[in-house]
Amino acid sequence: MIHPTAQIHPTSIVEAGAKIGENVVIGPFCLVGAEVEIGAGTILHSHVVVKGITKIGRDNQIFQFASIGDTNQDLKYQGEPTRTIIGDRNRIRESVTIHRGTAQGGSVTVIGDDNLLMVNVHVAHDCRIKNRCILANNATLAGHVELDDFVIVGGMSAIHQFVIVGAHVMLGGGSMVSQDVPPYVMAQGNHAKPFGVNIEGLKRRGFDKPTLHAIRNVYKLIYRSGKTLEEVMPEIEQVAAKESAISFFVEFFKRSTRGIIR
């Protein structure tokens, strides 16, 4: 079903069965598959390919040569009906690739709201990107990677399969990340190592001084106390009971399976 207010360039192909919402614009030479749903106000600028069981929300901008929802690169994939879901108000720049999920990984690749994926970013099968993340040019996420809110991934960085990157993390350009990165941390290198708290980013997002002080103290517990993570967790949980921002650490460590960067 194509909404009567949608604008579709005559050189584009929209297969029968696709659902195209109100005020959607599909520019020249695009291909939209039969099982695709595109929400109101979204713009496909030109030469965009959207395939598979893919749902795209409202007011997204998708630039030329982006490929969304196509077959993933997992060698175990046998054509199972898996999905790609993209939220609202994302900017997906030129030549970005976002692959559908696998049956082994929950069957869905998910991108939330208000994210910016710059030129040549690759998001592999079963990744989950939350909200307000920025992935700079040529950043690569392997399968099953999770990015929590407000993560910044520098250009030319690569993140290993199954890695979790906590909220408000900043990864410097050219980083190779093979283990989980706790919330609020700045990291860089091959392999990426932590080098402090993302103070400037947190200030820009309205974190007050007492909260920043609490986050710094937890960072010191994790990285400078000389204790194991198991030894410091009771202290972190005590702080989290009083300071909600610290609860991100507690939730993160419950999910972490690969160990954390050191």
From Swiss-Prot:
GO CC terms in record: cytoplasm; membrane
Subcellular location: Cytoplasm
EC number(s) recorded for this UniProt protein: 2.3.1.129
GO biological processes: lipid A biosynthetic process
Pfam family, one: Acetyltransf_11
CDD domains (alphabetical): LbH_UDP-GlcNAc_AT
GO molecular function: acyl-[acyl-carrier-protein]-UDP-N-acetylglucosamine O-acyltransferase activity
Main enzyme class: transferase
Biochemical pathway: Glycolipid biosynthesis; lipid IV(A) biosynthesis; lipid IV(A) from (3R)-3-hydroxytetradecanoyl-[acyl-carrier-protein] and UDP-N-acetyl-alpha-D-glucosamine: step 1/6
Catalytic function, reaction form: a (3R)-hydroxyacyl-[ACP] + UDP-N-acetyl-alpha-D-glucosamine = a UDP-3-O-[(3R)-3-hydroxyacyl]-N-acetyl-alpha-D-glucosamine + holo-[ACP]
Subunit structure: Homotrimer.
Family stated for the protein in its record: Belongs to the transferase hexapeptide repeat family. LpxA subfamily.
Record-given protein name: Acyl-[acyl-carrier-protein]--UDP-N-acetylglucosamine O-acyltransferase
GN (gene name): lpxA
